[in-house]
């Protein structure tokens, strides 16, 4: 909230124009995406704690989820860095990474559905893993969105 308040103060007092205004508005939008990333991370942590703490699933069964999470985690800092540096080349790279993450998510979803059909006892835990994977995929989408704000800041009107 403090950053959003600071953005509003800058707009009210300084009345930025053109590129400066686009940057302040982008920062304001980034805050929303970072908050949503935090919400998704919280969901993942709660599900992982529940799954592992209650021995509903072995840690090795979360390997692909961990791998997807590592890719997503590797997207957040570069997305923020791209915005700070106004690096449009990084936006393209992050967009490609997100496409791969989306494909990986779909492949993992198919694999988990097959696993549930083969072992109906695993349905509850597997559905939780699916929700975790979806949260990870959403985090990747938010990271890509943060990077895409670079395009809106750098484009001329």
Indicate residue ranges for each PLM-predicted region.
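Cytosolic, long alpha-helical scaffolding segments
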Residues: 1-157
């Amino acid at each position: 909230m403090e950053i959003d308040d600071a953005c509003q103060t800058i707009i009210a007092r300084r009345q930025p124009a053109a590129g400066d205004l686009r940057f302040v508005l982008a920062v304001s939008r980034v805050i929303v995406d970072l908050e949503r990333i935090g919400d998704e991370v919280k969901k993942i942590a709660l599900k992982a704690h529940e799954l592992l703490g209650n021995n509903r699933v072995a840690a090795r069964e979360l390997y692909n989820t961990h791998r997807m999470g590592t890719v997503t985690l590797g997207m957040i800092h570069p997305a923020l860095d791209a915005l700070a540096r106004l690096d449009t080349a990084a936006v393209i790279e992050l967009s490609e990474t997100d496409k791969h993450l989306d494909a990986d998510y779909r492949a993992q979803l198919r694999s988990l559905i097959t696993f549930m059909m083969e072992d109906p006892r695993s349905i509850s835990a597997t559905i939780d893993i699916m929700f975790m994977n979806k949260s990870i995929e959403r985090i990747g989408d938010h990271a890509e969105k943060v990077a895409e704000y670079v395009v809106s800041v750098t484009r001329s009107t």
